[in-house]
């Protein structure tokens, strides 16, 4: 099969936004205008096409990032058909893993902002993730028809809050109920969409008289921003020459691809205005797979030799699995992005991360929750495979004769845990299977069995994250579970350096004895660094080399469950510098036990402390409740970092220990009569005050 769409006409984009910016509605409209969807789904009545899990439709928030393919030839059919692969990303902070994961496989992004709420806390998180992966982006300021909508205010917030360089491509004509269309600042024409056909057709008109001055001012700004792309254009512009429409567009595109500017469009997805022009901007300004740098990886040659793959059908096949989803009819769906080469259904490829072969049984192109079976995929494609056996998020699938490992994704450590048990004993096995499958889909979710209590413990990124996991067990696997109280993931560490601490394990009672003797130093390491280091400074063979790994292992086993309260130990180094052994009685086990004794003793002497997770909390509240909100955060041991005005009141930024934040959503609702909202994400570990640490240690000791 030959390629049907040249790779230069591909756009792999993500649509990212804060929870209520109207992202799903925007995606729906894209699907409608690109002719995929014949009836527009509304989130309000739970019918949106992209939100395909039952819970998403109930909660009205997007949880799973679904991938969809659509074609667009421009509002005025001015382009050849372009293929747009859209990844819908969740906007809730508990699902930032999904956002991170999709940013990894995108070439460009559309950031959706609410014209009333502007740049919200979650938008900043998503922005940072897009920066991390150098994703070129444009913005769409949605909900221009809502009370309090203000386009230029949001443009200013993109500058001040995100530290970006926004350049409006358009201006809104009117706002709130009077919002009727937009001014195209490149063409210097007004665009009005036809309401009778839901905005499929439009007319170019003259700019309204009362907007001419403002439009000229912003047109100048736009042209100047374009001219900054090259000295040649700058000279032309400064020399008073007019830049052609093509020159302006090419220059702006160059600057977007270099991440120097963010072009800002506007509209109201709900009122069928603006999404069409935003789609044109996606084609004109966002990158094709050939516009972005080749993907980097390492060769599987034992030396980690750097390598890369270009977006080209003729290069060896390489793809990245970025999401595993469970489908009610076909089982596991593995979403993957093809970076190079071609693969056909029925082909066998290599999972280079696990050194295992996988066969592509069937390949499907997803349209939200509908699917179309296809025979092959090529460089630049995003598709899903059915029947892959052992692929995890972040694995590389590649040509068996040209193995490469593409960059691995980094996943955050969970910060909250709860115990779960099935309501009936019969469901125990089913629950294990369900949790195993959910953990495969979501690397930020972990499952383990507590050795002491034998309870099943699930851990994740926040209360909502775990609530949804429990909910999915019930819906998708028919397992009802009882849930315990949330537990905080504390850590243990030390503050002092101690030297020459001995550990001796000696047993002489008939038969072969056991003998191991070590002397260690222990010292604190920088937080957030390596976590643990082991240095072997044994001189003159006082401990034979074959026992050294056993000493390291003995210490590492102690790190899993610290001496204070059984929490993992972090940020410390151990130096082994002396000891003794016995020709007959010494063994690896004896040295392992000696090391663990030395570790416990050294830890006790080195000023041990308990670390607790601190969350970055942002609360948006009407001004009337400001005092209550701040008072409540202070009571929760919060440290207020600052406040700023928003369109609807104030935003309070604080750092608060996670242990104090349980049930906060309910308390905040009752304090503010449901008018405030908050977002929370993990920030760092910090030393817990003595009284808190004492209470935790006592509770663990019971």
Curated annotation (Swiss-Prot):
Q: What is its main location?
A: cytoplasm
Whether Cytoplasm counts among this entry's keywords is yes
Keyword presence, Transport = no
Q: Which CDD domains match?
A: EF-G, EFG_III, EFG_mtEFG1_IV, EFG_mtEFG_C, EFG_mtEFG_II
Listed InterPro entries:
EFG_II, EFG_III, EFG_III/V, EFG_IV, EFG_V, EFG_V-like, EFTu-like_2, G_TR_CS
UniProt KW keywords: Cytoplasm, Elongation factor, GTP-binding, Nucleotide-binding, Protein biosynthesis
According to its UniProt record, where is this protein located? Cytoplasm
**BP GO terms, sorted:** ribosome disassembly
Taking the record's annotation, the residue ranges forming a coiled coil are none
Task: Cite the GO molecular-function annotations of the record.
Answer: GTP binding; GTPase activity; guanosine tetraphosphate binding; translation elongation factor activity
At the top level, the lineage of the source is: Bacteria
Question: Could you tell me which residue ranges the tr-type G domain spans?
Answer: 8-290
Residues annotated to bind GTP: 17-24, 88-92, 142-145
Please give the GO cellular component terms listed in this UniProt entry: cytoplasm
What role does this protein play?
Catalyzes the GTP-dependent ribosomal translocation step during translation elongation. During this step, the ribosome changes from the pre-translocational (PRE) to the post-translocational (POST) state as the newly formed A-site-bound peptidyl-tRNA and P-site-bound deacylated tRNA move to the P and E sites, respectively. Catalyzes the coordinated movement of the two tRNA molecules, the mRNA and conformational changes in the ribosome.
> Which family, according to the similarity comment?
Belongs to the TRAFAC class translation factor GTPase superfamily. Classic translation factor GTPase family. EF-G/EF-2 subfamily.
The protein's name is: Elongation factor G
């Amino acid at each position: 099969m030959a390629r049907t769409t040249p790779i230069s006409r591909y756009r792999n984009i993500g649509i990212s936004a804060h929870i209520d910016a109207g992202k799903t509605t925007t995606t729906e409209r894209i699907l409608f205008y690109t002719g995929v969807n014949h009836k527009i789904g509304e989130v309000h009545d739970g019918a949106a096409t992209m939100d395909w899990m039952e819970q998403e439709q109930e909660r009205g928030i997007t949880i799973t990032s679904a991938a969809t393919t659509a074609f667009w030839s421009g509002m005025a059919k001015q382009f050849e058909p372009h293929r747009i692969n859209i990844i819908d990303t969740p906007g809730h902070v508990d699902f930032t893993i999904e956002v991170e994961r999709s940013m990894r496989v995108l070439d460009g992004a559309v950031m959706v902002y609410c014209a009333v709420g502007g740049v919200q806390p979650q938008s900043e998180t998503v922005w940072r993730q897009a920066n991390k992966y150098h994703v070129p982006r444009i913005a769409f300021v949605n909900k221009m028809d809502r009370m309090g909508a203000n386009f230029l205010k949001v443009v200013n917030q993109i500058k001040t809050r995100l530290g970006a360089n926004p350049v409006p491509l358009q201006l809104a004509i009117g706002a709130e109920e009077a919002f009727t269309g937009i001014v195209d600042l490149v063409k210097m024409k007004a665009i009005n969409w036809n309401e009778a056909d839901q905005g499929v057709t439009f007319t170019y008109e003259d700019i309204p008289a009362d907007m001419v001055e403002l439009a000229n001012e912003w047109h100048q700004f736009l042209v100047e921003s374009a001219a900054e792309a090259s000295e040649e254009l700058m000279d032309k512009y400064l020399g008073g020459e007019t830049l052609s429409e093509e020159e302006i567009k090419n220059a702006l595109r160059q600057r977007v691809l270099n991440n120097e500017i963010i072009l800002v469009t506007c509209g109201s997805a709900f009122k069928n205005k603006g999404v069409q022009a935003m789609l044109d901007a996606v084609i004109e300004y966002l990158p094709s797979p050939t516009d972005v740098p080749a993907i980097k990886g390492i060769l599987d040659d034992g030396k980690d030799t750097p390598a890369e793959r270009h977006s080209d059908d003729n290069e060896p096949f390489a793809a990245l699995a970025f999401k595993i989803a469970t489908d009610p009819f076909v089982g596991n769906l593995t979403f993957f992005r093809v970076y190079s080469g071609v693969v056909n259904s029925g082909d066998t490829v290599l999972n280079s991360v696990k050194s295992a072969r996988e066969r592509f049984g069937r390949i499907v192109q997803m349209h939200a929750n509908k699917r179309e079976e296809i025979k092959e995929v090529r460089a630049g494609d995003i598709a899903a495979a059915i029947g892959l056996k052992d692929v995890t998020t972040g694995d590389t699938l590649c040509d068996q004769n040209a193995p490469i490992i593409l960059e691995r994704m980094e996943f955050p450590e969970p910060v909250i845990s709860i115990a779960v048990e099935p309501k009936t004993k019969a469901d125990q096995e089913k629950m294990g299977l369900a949790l195993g499958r959910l953990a495969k889909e979501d690397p930020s979710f972990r499952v383990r069995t507590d050795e002491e209590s034998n309870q099943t413990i699930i851990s994740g990124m926040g209360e909502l994250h775990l609530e949804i996991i429990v909910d999915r067990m019930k819906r998708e696997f028919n397992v009802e579970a009882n849930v315990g109280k949330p537990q905080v993931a504390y850590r243990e560490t030390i503050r002092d350096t101690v030297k020459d601490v001995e550990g001796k394990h000696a047993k002489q009672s008939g038969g072969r004895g056991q003998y191991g003797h070590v002397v260690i130093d222990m010292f604190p390491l920088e937080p957030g660094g390596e976590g643990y280091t082991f240095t072997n400074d044994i001189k003159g063979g006082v401990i034979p080399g074959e026992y050294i790994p056993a000493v390291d292992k003995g210490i590492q086993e102690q790190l899993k469950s610290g001496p204070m309260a059984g929490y993992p130990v972090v940020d410390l180094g151990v130096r082994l510098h002396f000891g003794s052994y016995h020709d007959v009685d010494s063994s690896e086990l004896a040295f392992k036990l000696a090391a663990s004794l030395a570790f416990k003793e050294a830890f006790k002497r080195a000023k041990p402390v308990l670390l607790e997770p601190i969350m970055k909390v942002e609360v948006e509240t009407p001004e009337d409740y400001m005092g209550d909100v701040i008072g409540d955060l202070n009571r929760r041991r919060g440290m207020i970092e600052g406040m700023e005005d928003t369109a609807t009141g104030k935003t309070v930024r604080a750092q608060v220990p996670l242990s104090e934040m349980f049930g906060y959503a309910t308390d905040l609702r009752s304090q503010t009569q449901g008018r405030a909202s908050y977002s929370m994400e993990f920030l760092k570990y910090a030393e817990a005050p003595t009284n808190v640490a004492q209470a935790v240690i006592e509770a663990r000791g019971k």
